[in-house]
Design a protein with these regions (language model features):
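...captures the hydrophobic TM-helix bundle architecture rather than a specific catalytic motif
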Residues: 1-203
Length: 203
């Protein structure tokens, strides 16, 4: 009996969840950053509306007529939603050891992210107002620039996790890398919704 106990296999060491925890912390930090930027934007805009309504000095036209088009911003929103589904597809595929579909889903996710960046650069170019022309234009460039930077980081992260998946580091027993990439990607999708509403809808 004692011999059986002595030769019993050691308990399996639990996997480190460092990548998932780090990604969750990065996502939380990003949400706080954009919440601060949105707060500044809303505060300055409400103050501007107060000045205009009360005919006080300092009020200004927020954006020139037709400077911000609804179609490009809305198209970007739908593109981010589609990318959320492809990212979720990648996670499910790697959990099922369906590597082919995982690679396809990751590739489509990266493609969607690149499309959003392209659309956003087009929207900025189409805006046609220099960054130093007014406070509203500065805020618009700041919000769009911050989002482009974060989305670019998310694309690189998904690409790196995809390369690791190609190397065989992730499977049904260890999908942490793809799940971590999904956390960052879903954060980018969530952040765009208030950005779309503030810039495209309320203008």
């Amino acid at each position: 009996m004692e011999a059986d106990v002595m030769h019993a296999p050691a308990a399996e060491v639990g996997r480190s969840r460092t990548l998932l925890i780090g990604s969750a912390l990065a996502a939380a930090s990003t949400l706080m950053l954009f919440a601060g930027l949105f707060g500044v934007y809303i505060s300055i805009r409400q103050n501007n509306e107060y000045l205009i309504e009360n005919q006080l000095d300092g009020g200004m036209l927020w954006f020139p007529d037709l400077a911000v088009q609804i179609a490009p911003g809305t198209m970007m929103m739908f593109t981010t939603w589609i990318s959320a589904f492809t990212m979720a597809w990648a996670v499910q595929a790697i959990r099922n050891d369906d590597r082919r579909n995982a690679y396809v889903a990751l590739g489509l996710t990266i493609l969607m992210g690149a499309a959003v960046i392209n659309q956003m650069v087009f929207a900025i170019t189409d805006f046609g107002v220099p960054i130093d022309r007014s406070v509203p234009s500065l805020l618009l460039y700041t919000l769009y620039g911050a989002y482009i930077a974060f989305l670019a980081i998310a694309i690189i992260f998904v690409l790196l996790m995809g390369i690791r998946a190609l190397a065989g580091q992730f499977d049904s027993t260890n999908a942490d890398g793809i799940e971590a990439a999904a956390i960052i990607w879903f954060t980018a999708v969530i952040v765009y919704l208030p950005l779309w509403y503030l810039i495209t809808i309320t203008k």
